[in-house]
C-alpha cells in the first residue's frame, strides 16, 4: 500500500458484515470510513504504516553528535545519508555505510520482527553536527515494508464501528445520562495500537 492509502480494503471490511464482495452499494461509505480511521490511527500513533515505493530526501536535526532519529524507513535500498558540515543548507558530505549503524538492530522491537529503521547511529570517526539548522539529510524509501497485522485489525475494528454508526452528527453517537456520547477510538483498537505509538501516554 502506498503512503496515504487506508490500512485495509473495502472487501476486508465487507467480510466483517458478511457483505458479498460483489455488493458495491456501500463501497463509498466503506472507503470513507477506512480512510478516516487510517488518518486517525496515524495521528494517534504519530507515524504512518504504508510504503513509499521510491526514495525521497528528508532533513533532520540530530539529538546528539552520535544519534539522529528519523522517520520510519523499511529498506537500505536507495539509502543515502548526507550531512551539512558548515550550516549553509547544502548536504555536501555523503556518509559511507561503515560510518553509521541503523536501529532497531535486525528490525526487532520487544521480540517482534518487521519493524522499520528509525535511528541512525554514528559509529565511525565522523560525528553529526548539532545546530539550529537540520544538519542531516536522509534519502530513503519511507514507511513500513508491510502494514502490521495489529494496525490493520485496529483499522477494521474502528471502521466497522464508524460504518455502523452511520452519519453521527458532530461526532455524537447518542445521548447518555450525562449528555451526548461522542465517537472515540475503540478501546480494543487502542490496545492493539499501543506498541506502535511514538509517544505513549504514561499512567501513574
Question: Model-predicted segments: where are they?
Answer:
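Divalent metal-cofactor coordination and adjacent catalytic microenvironments
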Residues: 1-204
